[in-house]
A protein has these predicted regions:
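Structured C-terminal helix/loop/strand segments within mature extracytoplasmic catalytic/sensor domains
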Residues: 127-177
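Generic anion/oxyanion-binding catalytic loop in active/binding sites
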Residues: 1, 45, 130
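Acidic side chains
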Residues: 2, 86-89, 137
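Single conserved hydrophobic/aromatic residue that forms the stacking wall/gate
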Residues: 1-13
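Conserved active-site loop region of the serine DD-peptidase/beta-lactamase
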Residues: 18-126, 174
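Glycine-centered small-residue hotspots that permit tight backbone geometry or close packing
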Residues: 8, 101, 128-131
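Loop/helix-junction capping segments adjacent to catalytic residues or to phosphate/diphosphate-binding pockets
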Residues: 12, 53, 154-155
Length: 177
């Protein structure tokens, strides 16, 4: 391999938005560093939501308004559900859709059909580091939380997580009919 070519590609990568997004100022340069109390409390934007699967599911029950305390007012729950941006994500290099604070399944602009099925029918949530995933599905009154014991290195949920989501949604669909 030509070292000048390698160096040139590295320089190109460093100018990309994805490099800035995934290389923080405090230097979390490995998966192992992410799983420490110091990293969790560092206050890095878009990082640090540490919870159990049960805790994530309970949070999304609150997002649906199905919690005992009614933490989120109806208007706020509307902001969670309504997509405000849907299109190409220049950082992740894939289509994404977001409401205020939550991911949604992106839609094909030509047909309106979902490009991915990660959040249920009209659902919203967030993919987490390493394959963890959580969401609320308002159509079924369902909240879902999945925390991995061993990190998957995909940016979006990998095959294992997607298969689990598919199995849950299939079961929910069968229960409703």
């Amino acid at each position: 391999r030509d070292s000048s070519t390698s160096r040139g590609l590295g320089d190109v990568y460093k100018r990309q938005p994805v490099h800035r997004a995934f290389n923080t100022l405090i230097g979390l340069n490995s998966v192992r560093q992410m799983n420490t109390p110091e990293a969790w409390s560092s206050g890095v934007p878009a990082f640090g939501g540490v919870a159990s699967a049960r805790g994530m599911a309970q949070f999304y029950q609150a997002c649906l308004g199905l919690d005992e305390l009614r933490v989120f007012p109806s208007a706020v729950r509307g902001w969670m559900r309504n997509v405000v941006i849907d299109g190409p994500d220049l950082t992740l290099k894939t289509p994404t859709a977001f409401s205020c604070g939550f991911m949604h399944d992106p839609a094909d602009p030509a047909t309106g059909r979902k490009l991915r099925h990660l959040f249920g029918s009209g659902g919203f949530g967030h993919a987490g580091a390493g394959g963890s995933h959580a969401f609320a599905d308002p159509a079924h009154g369902l909240s879902f939380g999945y925390a991995m014991n061993r990190m998957d290195l995909n940016v979006l949920p990998g095959v294992k997580t997607r298969n689990l989501i598919s199995a849950v949604m299939k079961e929910v669909a069968e229960e409703c009919f």
